[in-house]
Each structure stands twice: as C-alpha cells, then as structure tokens.
C-alpha cells in the first residue's frame, strides 16, 4: 500500500510539469488568425518593363518570413496588452526593441519594416507614387485637339455658316482718272468735218485719221461717241434705223426719266 501511494505522488508532479510545458508551448506558438500582409501589385507597363519587377516580390516574401520568425516572442505577450517588437536597424546585426500597446502594434511594425527594407521598400512606394502622379496629371491636363480641328470652317462658330468676304471698295483718287484730251482748233475742225460726212468710222478710216491728226485711235473713237450722245440728248429723236426696228418689234430700248416720261413719248 505504501508503494502505491508513493507511485501516485510521483505521477502527480509529472502531470503538473507536463501541463506547464504545454502552456509554455501554447504561449510561444503564434496565434492562428495572424496573416501576413499582402501587397497589391499594379500591373502598369512601366512597372512590368523594369528589371526588378519579378525579384522584388521574392525579396519581400523572404524578409516577411524572417520578420515573423523574430517576432514570435513579441507576439506571445498579447494577453498582457504590452508587445515588444524586435526591428533590425541595419546590416550590422543590431536590433531595436520597441514596446507598444494595443492596436498601434501593427502600424508601427509596418513602418519599421518598410524603413528596414531600404531600397526595396522605397522603390515599391516610388513606383506606386509615380503611377498615381501620372494618373492625376492625365486627369488635370486638358484635352489637346489636333491643329486641323481649329482650321476647319465650321469648328469655332458652327451656327454662323460659311464665311463671306466683302470686297473692299477701292478709293478712287483724282490722279487715277484719265486726263481729258485737249484738242487743238485744227483737230476739232477736222473731226467735225469727218463727223458731218459719216457719224460712224470704220477701223481703217479711224487708223488713217489718227495718223493724220497725231492722236490715238481711242481718243478719236471716244470723241465720236460723245458727239453722237450729245446730239441724241439734245434732239430726243431716234435715228431712222431705230425707228425701223421698233416698227418690226425688234428694238425697244425705251427708258424712263426722273419725270416719269419715257423716250417714246
């Protein structure tokens, strides 16, 4: 009987030590709901064409595993409300212990890990910032239309129709007018005698008369036209040819004067 009691006493401390060891293991084990932070990758053409596009993810995953392994001891103190985070400061192997409470643990841990990652973290952040800046610049910059849009006829004022240019009136100066011909007495006497014989000159007769009087053909032609107009205006009678054509109904150039009387009256 005494031996059985001794055996029972020896078993009880062994069970107590086993329970204590199990509790220690449970405290050391990381909680099951802890999940590593996954970063969203922006698949822009600029990011894909960079040489460090595929390598960056592998380095981040490897450093995340190292970071979670070092922080198992710090995460075991979640029940007390105070947590210690071991963060590597540089390549020398020295570490820095930070004591945080409550919900600030995850934010500070992420900031310190990004600082410890050095170029990798900075590069990832810079790539994201570059993409966001490019998108913001694209939205802020106004749309640039091609030049031919502004050169078309109806682009700037579609409701006004085609453009019409009004011709500018040329200011007639006195110098542009043709000076009047000053005929001599002999020239006037010869022109009047020629007009008495024939009121209409042929081309050959006009050329010979211009050579004799030393005038241009146009000057002689204009003098004859003016002479016929003066006679017609003074008499008001139509010539025989006009009367013959009017009788046949082939000629009727009657005009109305300011007084309301026509030439035929």
Swiss-Prot record:
MF terms in GO: DNA-binding transcription factor activity, RNA polymerase II-specific; RNA polymerase II cis-regulatory region sequence-specific DNA binding
Comp. bias regions, Low complexity: 122-136
GO CC annotations, alphabetized: nucleus
InterPro entries: Engrailed_Homeobox_TFs (IPR050720), HD (IPR001356), HD_engrailed (IPR000747), HD_metazoa (IPR020479), Homeobox-engrailed_C-terminal (IPR019549), Homeobox-engrailed_CS (IPR019737), Homeobox_CS (IPR017970), Homeodomain-like_sf (IPR009057)
Compartments (UniProt record): Nucleus
Keyword Manganese attributed: no
Coiled coil: none
Keyword annotations of the record: Developmental protein, DNA-binding, Homeobox, Nucleus
UniProt record, GO biological process: neuron differentiation; regulation of transcription by RNA polymerase II
Region spans: Disordered: 1-38, 60-138, 156-182
Protein's UniProt keywords contain DNA damage: no
Portion annotated as DNA-binding: 176-235
Basic and acidic residues compositional bias, start-end: 1-12, 102-115
Family: Belongs to the engrailed homeobox family.
Protein name from the UniProt record: Homeobox protein engrailed-2-B
UniProt source species: Xenopus laevis
Higher taxonomy: Eukaryota, Metazoa, Chordata, Craniata, Vertebrata
């Amino acid at each position: 009987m005494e031996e059985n009691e001794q055996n029972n006493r020896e078993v009880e401390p062994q069970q107590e030590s086993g329970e204590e060891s199990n509790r220690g293991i449970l405290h050391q084990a990381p909680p099951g709901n802890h999940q590593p932070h996954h970063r969203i990758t922006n698949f822009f053409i600029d990011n894909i064409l960079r040489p460090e596009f595929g390598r960056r993810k592998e380095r981040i995953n490897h450093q995340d595993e190292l970071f979670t392994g070092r922080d198992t001891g710090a995460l075991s103190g979640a029940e007390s409300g105070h947590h210690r985070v071991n963060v590597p400061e540089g390549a020398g192997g020295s570490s820095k212990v930070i004591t945080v409470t409550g919900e600030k643990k995850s934010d500070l841990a992420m900031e310190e890990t990004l600082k410890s990652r050095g170029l990798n973290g900075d590069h990832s952040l810079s790539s994201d910032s570059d993409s966001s800046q490019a998108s913001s610049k694209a939205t802020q910059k106004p749309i640039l239309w091609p030049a031919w849009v502004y050169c078309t006829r109806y682009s700037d004022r579609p409701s006004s129709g085609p453009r019409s240019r009004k011709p500018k009136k040329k200011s007639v100066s006195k110098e542009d007018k043709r000076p009047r011909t000053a005929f001599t007495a002999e020239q006037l006497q010869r022109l009047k005698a020629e007009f008495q014989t024939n009121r209409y000159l042929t081309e050959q007769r006009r050329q010979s008369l211009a050579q004799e009087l030393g005038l241009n053909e146009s000057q002689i032609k204009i003098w004859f036209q003016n002479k016929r107009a003066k006679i017609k205006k003074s008499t008001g009678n139509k010539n025989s040819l006009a009367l013959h054509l009017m009788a046949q109904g082939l000629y009727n150039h009657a005009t109305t004067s300011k007084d309301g009387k026509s030439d035929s009256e």
